[in-house]
Amino acid sequence: MEQTPKANRVHIGFFGRCNAGKSTLINMLTDQPVSLVSEVAGTTTDPVSKAMEILPLGPVVITDTAGIDDTSELGALRIEKSEEIIKKINLAVYVLRNDEAPTADDMMWLNKLKQNNVPIALFINEINASDSESAHNNDSNGNDTNLNYVDAYPDLSAIATVVGSTDFTSNRDRLTLLDLLGGLTPLDVEGEQSLLQGLVDPGDTIILVCPIDSAAPKGRLILPQVQTIREILDHKGLALVCQTEELPTMLSKLSQKPKLVITDSQAFEAVNALTPADIPLTSFSILMARFKGKLQDLVTGVKALNNLKPGARVLISEGCTHRRQCDDIGTVKIPMWLKKKGYTDLQLEFTSGGAFPKDVSGYDLIIHCGACMLTRREVLRRIDCAVVQGTPIVNYGVLIASLHGILERAISPFMDELDRKGFEC
């Protein structure tokens, strides 16, 4: 893995009316023609994303969205796509033109962002600005002469932070605007947390069991495995990697027992049998459940297995899109394990990527992947969506551990924090 995973970056969404200058601003900030720019309204259709670095924020993903007032034939669908972006971003940039007053649509969207607890940065596009103007021109009293627009509409500053104003067609203020944007505080950034928080100390040995089967990507490890190795290194620990069959050999060569064994969830049953009972064991998926979401809710959700009857509706949701293999964990192995444990005649439904139903009240159980490709904000939204609608939700690792009768062992490394939240296994 040579770049920061997309899910671990700060996600910044750009919003505003058609021809406000969103695409022009993005092209100026990235110094690349990321988005199509035209005087014709509605040139941005589906959201367009670009990964880059904005210091001191660090690695980010910026997303251009369709105009909020798109009245074209597909305008409603484009606006719906923009609304989906709100659920995934950590920071919003709202673009207004200095020659047009804010509209009711502008205020509605600004309030919509605020209601979703997304910090908002206002950028004012100075149409026909002179070359002498800059992002922050001050008069003799030190007042910002470019922000008179916002002064005229005080409702704006009550909702959003005014970052700056300039002519987006000019690159002269690019670095200034990048500095201003980089100094903002985004919402709920994953990078501020740790996948192995409280589990690894300097010098600790951690064994990672990484099965290589037909579903494994050729020539590389999967993202959770790579992220875990990096986390161990960051904590000055020792990362040892093997496949399931080599675990006994690796354990026999150690003079001291490892601090923790972490396995791919699909190998839980075999690794549990091979790992001595006095060595803590968990899985990459359960680590992700703790890192990305709410482990307590996901572990509580597994109790719904006791109530599954023939004909029950079960949603199995993947956060990424990949080609299904003959031993795919979501569409093949989990249904097989459920059937082996007596959960027969279930109505299984599947989603992948960004698809996730708004109404999940009709499901008896939601089984979600580890969500390594989704932002923490999106994972929390999905969990909250299920909890609010009274639908139990569990993730792959927790479910598989429960089906193999080892849930208590698999979550034992986290019992202190679960106990503090009043959890009962």
Model-derived regions: residue spans:
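Conserved GTPase G-domain signal focused on the G5
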Residues: 21, 130-131, 155, 162-188, ...
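G-domain G4 guanine-recognition motif of GTPases
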Residues: 65, 96-99, 120-135, 146-152, ...
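Switch II of P-loop NTPase G domains
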Residues: 43-49, 65-89, 95-113, 190-196, ...
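Conserved C-terminal guanine-recognition region of P-loop GTPase G domains, centered on the G4
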Residues: 54-58, 77-163, 221-236, 246-250, ...
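C-terminal end of P-loop GTPase domains and the immediately downstream helical coupling element
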Residues: 166-233, 238-255, 316-317
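C-terminal effector/interaction modules appended to NTPase cores
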Residues: 17-23, 219-425
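Conserved hydrophobic helix-helix packing surfaces used for dimerization/oligomerization
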Residues: 12, 206, 312-314
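Conserved G1/Walker A P-loop phosphate-binding module
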Residues: 1-76, 84
